[in-house]
Amino acid sequence: MIITRVSFLIFISLLSVCHIPQTETSNKTTIVTGADQVNRYLPLLKGKRVGMLVNQTSIIGDKLSVDSLRSLGVQIVAIFGPEHGFRANASNGAVVKDEINPETGIPIISLYGKKRKPSKEDMAKLDVMIFDVADVGCRFYTNINTLADVMEACAENDKPLIIFDRPNPNGFVDGPVLDMNLKSGIGKFPIPITHGMTIGEFAQMVNGEGWLPNKMKCNITVIKLKNYAHDMDYTLPVHPSPNLNTQQSVLLYPSLCLFEGTIISQGRGTHMPFTVLGAPALKGKY
């Protein structure tokens, strides 16, 4: 069946408005992220060797949280990077190598390369771990899997985990729950496609549902958001990954990413990723 230009545009338009929250934040008190509440967690870091799972979205104000905490005297001994790397300069699914930060000498350990969770040797160098990465609230966006892997490493090595909570731009629940017979690296938990939770809430669910191996519990402290509601229209201040470079792409991602199971491209590698669809087999102009 040939898809007409009009029907295609209607399809994209419907996806664009589907589940976009109606509550505006312009007249509300500014959302305060977990990372911004320095006075709440700084005492927990005093005199401790700190590891941080962070990337380009990990900011306090307009400064990277790593730099902000170092300026406050926090002893950061290791940085861990998720998919796309600490600087978000790796493509989706690409292996990211370990490196040393040339300015600080702090090791940057990839959790999207040879290993997916911190090793026992990594954890032995830490007293506490921080997780501070923005998420887009989608089951197959790998940050929640990395969070669970970090929780597992902390539980195995009896190390506390502090989570700086951040808003979910897709703060609604939709889509089928994962069939666990189809469990994979991009789908590890029985949750819907869009789960509606913040990263801190998801961590609490992992603990509460006993989803870590052998039903281990991770000692987590969530620095909760202030002035946040799940139905708020929220735009991430920093693009979460190379191919989610606009608010529209973030909102369309849970729907358009499903086309990765077909011959249809979602615009990766173009200047409009996750806002267009196309394939050589499609006839006509769009």
Predicted regions and their residues:
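Bacterial Sec-dependent N-terminal signal peptides
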Residues: 1-28
